[in-house]
From Swiss-Prot:
Segments crossing the lipid bilayer: none
Reaction(s) this enzyme catalyzes, per UniProt: a plastoquinone + NADH + (n+1) H(+)(in) = a plastoquinol + NAD(+) + n H(+)(out); a plastoquinone + NADPH + (n+1) H(+)(in) = a plastoquinol + NADP(+) + n H(+)(out)
Membrane topology: Peripheral membrane protein
Example GO molecular function: NAD binding
Family listed: Belongs to the complex I 49 kDa subunit family.
PROSITE patterns: COMPLEX1_49K
Protein name according to UniProt: NAD(P)H-quinone oxidoreductase subunit H, chloroplastic
GO biological process: photosynthesis, light reaction
NCBIfam families: PRK06075.1, PRK07415.1
InterPro entries assigned to the protein according to its UniProt record, in alphabetical order: NADH_Q_OxRdtase_suD, NADH_UbQ_OxRdtase_49kDa_CS, NDH1_su_D/H, NiFe-Hase_large
Entry keyword Methyltransferase: no
Any GO CC annotation of this UniProt entry: chloroplast thylakoid membrane
Quaternary structure note: NDH is composed of at least 16 different subunits, 5 of which are encoded in the nucleus.
Length: 397
């Protein structure tokens, strides 16, 4: 007896672009066979603003306020990469004090970015409580940013040759207090999240990426280190003054969503270690000490005081707004919270770049999403997408 052949009906589902779990205006066209994902096609471009072309029509100092709109949750890194390129082209030396302050701000920005990844990631998989916890700690970071830069977000703090202003009175003590407090909160996160059996059920073994596969897809940041590859540009390139501090690359072997979570959680602890060392070893010490020593110098008429040393300044000689970019090519990169943030820069002996190519980590890391979600369940899409950590401002540029 012959049986009738049943036709296999596939369902096409649109997720986004206006969806709370999309982390921006991302649209996914998902093909389903029941609850199983057959195909996934990301649709990009909803937040494209022509950031590269804008850079090619602006002087660097004019373009700095724009770059904070790429990854608007880690704006210090976009500012850092924007000034690092011209500094290398012009052989501009950065005072040691300015470099230390840059590192402090970069690591605080890394913590803020990872915190705002953790909360929505937990909310995506059904845990609402950590979402409110992370905003409590993030407020402390933003208070430090506001005290030092005047802005909670979009800081516009980095300058070619240094930073815009020195640290204000009492800022170092306030930051040290935050470091001590935050380490206890990371332990609380581990108790609340890492040992939760429901959380482990949702993330363990979901979205596995092997080490060789991660390299072939050009993944970077926590996505790469969670797959067993110990690669961190702070150790590899040794930019700023990271080689003066003691810290370890955080990595995992499993390559799943749980491994990516563990890497980011551990990175926040390492960032605190770097910040504490930078604050304690800051050349010149707190600003009030520098001011007092400068006053003593005037009383004693010591014109060549060590406290007037180049390394104790917050910026070297300020270049003019029409600072010319020499005629050469250059690729610079930093280890941003989401991965390798790079700039390919071509100067043509004018005040504006001839070519300004952005290499955003989120755009590169997002490419592997269709491969990760195939043959998974519909509910796992949000878990995997959340573990990648994207911001559409830098994906679309």
């Amino acid at each position: 007896m012959s049986r009738p052949v049943r036709r296999k009906d596939l369902m096409i589902v649109n997720i986004g672009p206006h969806h709370p779990s999309m982390h921006g205006v991302l649209r996914l066209i998902v093909t389903l066979d029941g609850e199983d994902v057959v195909d996934c096609q990301p649709i990009l471009g909803y937040l494209h603003r022509g950031m590269e072309k804008i850079a090619e029509n602006r002087a660097i100092i004019q373009y700095l306020p724009y770059v904070t709109r790429w990854d608007y949750l880690a704006t210090m890194f976009t500012e850092a990469i924007t000034v690092n390129g011209p500094e290398q082209l012009g052989n501009i030396q950065v005072p040691k004090r300015a470099s230390y302050i840059r590192v402090i701000m970069l690591e605080l920005s890394r913590i803020a970015s990872h915190l705002l990844w953790l909360g929505p990631f937990m909310a995506d998989i059904g845990a609402q409580t950590p979402f409110f916890y992370i905003f409590r700690e993030r407020e402390f970071v933003y208070d430090l940013f506001e005290a030092a830069t005047g802005m909670r977000m979009m800081h516009n703090f980095f300058r070619i040759g240094g930073i815009a202003a020195d640290l204000p009175y009492g800022w170092i003590d306030k930051c040290l207090d935050f470091c001590d407090y935050f380490l206890t909160e990371v332990v609380e996160y581990q108790k609340l999240i890492t040992r939760n059996p429901i959380f482990l059920e949702r993330v363990e073994g979901v979205g596995i990426i092997g080490g060789e596969e991660a390299i072939n897809w050009s993944l970077s940041g926590p996505m790469l280190r969670a797959s067993g590859i110990q690669w961190d540009l702070r150790k590899v390139d040794r930019y700023e003054c990271y080689d003066e501090f003691e810290w370890e690359i955080q990595w995992q072997k499993q390559g799943d969503s749980l491994a990516r979570y563990l890497v980011r959680l551990s990175e926040m602890t390492e960032s605190i270690k770097i910040i504490q060392q930078a604050l304690e070893g800051l050349p010149g010490g707190p600003y009030e000490n520098l001011e007092r020593r400068d006053f003593d110098k005037k009383l004693n008429s010591e014109m060549n005081s060590e406290w007037n040393n180049f390394d104790y300044r917050f910026i070297s000689k300020k270049p003019s707004p029409t600072f010319e970019l020499s005629k050469q090519e250059l690729y610079v990169r930093v280890e941003a919270p989401k991965g390798e943030l790079g700039i390919f820069l071509i100067g043509d002996q004018s005040g504006v770049p001839w070519r300004w190519k952005i290499r955003p980590p989120g755009f590169i890391n997002l490419q592997i999403l269709p491969e990760l979600v195939k043959r998974m369940k519909l509910a796992d899409i949000m878990t995997i997408l959340g573990s990648i950590d994207i911001i559409m401002g830098e994906v679309d540029r």
